[in-house]
Amino acid sequence: MSFTVDDRVLALAGIAQALQQVRRIADTGHSDAAAVRTAVESVFRVDASSPQEVFGDRHALKAGLRLLHNYFRSQGQDPILPKLALSVLQLERRFVQEGETVNKVASGIERAQRQAAELGDSGHPDVLANLGGLYADTISHLKPRVMVQGNPHYLGQAGVVAEIRALLLAAVRSAVLWRQLGGSYWDFLFSRKAMIEAVDRQLA
């Protein structure tokens, strides 16, 4: 199956949207519930092979697409977010090379998915705590570590930390998808115009 730049920008939007919520929670202690659910549910769709299967309707990624639209035009408001995204893309490369870690994450995701089904809510605090703990026990030990800055008051709260880690797991999942769709660092150098046009099409 062949994939296009339109598919790849959706995966990048998934990364951007998850990390936007990471930044928001770290600074304010609050998140957008719909964006968090989109991120968590993308983690549960581990066997999906296309961004449509992973994220559903592209409108679920509207915030992420708008972020890409702004950053590709050097209009991004948060200079830290692109640095986080780069760290996630680098971390994904290390993660997929660690077979034992990949297997542990896959098993943990299955358990969290069953929990979400029982609770009837993929964004339930217990589900976020489960996924956050999974990230802490596995991917967080790999380098480069994704360093999240924010308000110490909120970063000292267990629930906030768990939600941030769950969203980082979702960002890594989107990074894996981006690679599976043929994404590479060269895209940002040689396919920038095509990526901008693809983002605009998705937002139309």
From Swiss-Prot:
It is found in: Cytoplasm; Cell inner membrane. The keyword Nuclease does not apply. InterPro entries: HflD (IPR007451), HflD-like_sf (IPR035932). Keywords: Cell inner membrane, Cell membrane, Cytoplasm, Membrane. Its main location: cytoplasm. Belongs to the HflD family. This is High frequency lysogenization protein HflD homolog. Pfam families: DUF489. It is a peripheral membrane protein. The keyword Membrane applies. The lineage of its organism: Bacteria, Pseudomonadati, Pseudomonadota, Gammaproteobacteria, Lysobacterales. It comes from Stenotrophomonas maltophilia (strain R551-3).
